[in-house]
Amino acid sequence: MASGKAGGASALFSEATQAEQLDSHTYRVNLNQGFCIGAVPNGGYTSACMLAAASKHLGPRGQPDTLTAHFEYPNRTSTGPAIVVIEDVKLGRQISTLHLTLWQGGLLSQAPWIDRSVSRRIVLAYTTHTNLRTFSGISMPTGYEVTPAAELPSVSDFEALKTHGADDAWAESKLPKGWAAMMLSLTQWRFYVPRKEPLSPGVLDMWIRLASGEKITQGALAYVVDSFPHNMHTFLAAPALRELLNASPERSGDSEVKDVRKKDQQRAEMWFPTVVMNIEAKTALPEEGVEWLSVRVSSKQIKEGKFDLEVLVRDTDGEMVALSNHVAMILSVERNTGKKSGSSKASL
């Protein structure tokens, strides 16, 4: 596995999510700096590390795939070692349910691995696991499948996107100059968004791939559904607000335009931590993974410093891969980078 240190920004996702078994129900992971927003590892990446431990735990039972997962993030994660403790809630023939707890601070080099007087519960999860490749049962088409919302966005000229960063319909969303150091997690991805207006009002459609060239596997889905371009808010915004953001130079002196653009410039000073995240896997990706996925993101309400997200993930054939729902907050970036109380010393 990765070393006990925080690790650099160049690690591959598959390397940065390795889980080492310490005993029958305890695993060690290493949260890598390259997957951080500010000082905090991305919540989806951290969740993927936990699910890697769960997959290893249930692999001998032939249930390596996550079917559903509910994550809560009561405390802020840090880079470096963490302990994942697994409780078998119910071990079934087709589906098993686990309770996962990720601990940091005061970690020990031998059993019991954590010091409960110092260590902190950082992330909690209830998860269900199965084998998606052998799962079978009744299927039927739904009315949703014939609605406009179910239509797959136009398939990109993927080679043009990789070579030139754009095609006729899509263009890469690039971080503004100076943002990369703060948003290392976003540099792990290439996000391609509509070149013009959102395909649907208040909806972000995008094609994504890993910047490293790695294929996206089943184990990456928790990270997929929690990774968004820096300008996502401009797509989720109401059409009238988006019009102000994109107003012509002739309107640059308008008070409304100036006010909206001033607030938009404050985006770099904001942090959007996830409070709760739910995931449901709809189908199994190929074992070797895929290069491209289509992701659709929408929000019902952004109000008083909190917001919801609904995420739909599909493959290039339009097959539904995963669904996810989030509750998140909008906080000052100082809440991300400020010092935490309590000891975080680890001996692992």
Curated annotation (Swiss-Prot):
One Pfam family in the UniProt entry: 4HBT_3
SUPFAM superfamilies per UniProt: Thioesterase/thiol ester dehydrase-isomerase
Keyword Thylakoid: no
Example GO molecular function: hydrolase activity
The protein's annotated pathway: Secondary metabolite biosynthesis
Keywords: Hydrolase
Superkingdom of this protein's organism: Eukaryota
EC number, as in UniProt: 3.1.2.-
Function: Thioesterase-like protein; part of the gene cluster that mediates the biosynthesis of wortmanamides A and B, reduced long-chain polyketides amidated with a specific omega-amino acid, 5-aminopentanoic acid (5PA). The PKS modules of TwmB are involved in the synthesis of the polyketide backbone, whereas the non-canonical C domain of TwmB is a bonafide condensation domain that specifically selects 5PA and catalyzes amidation to release polyketide chain.
Protein's name in the database: Thioesterase-like protein TwmA
Gene: TwmA
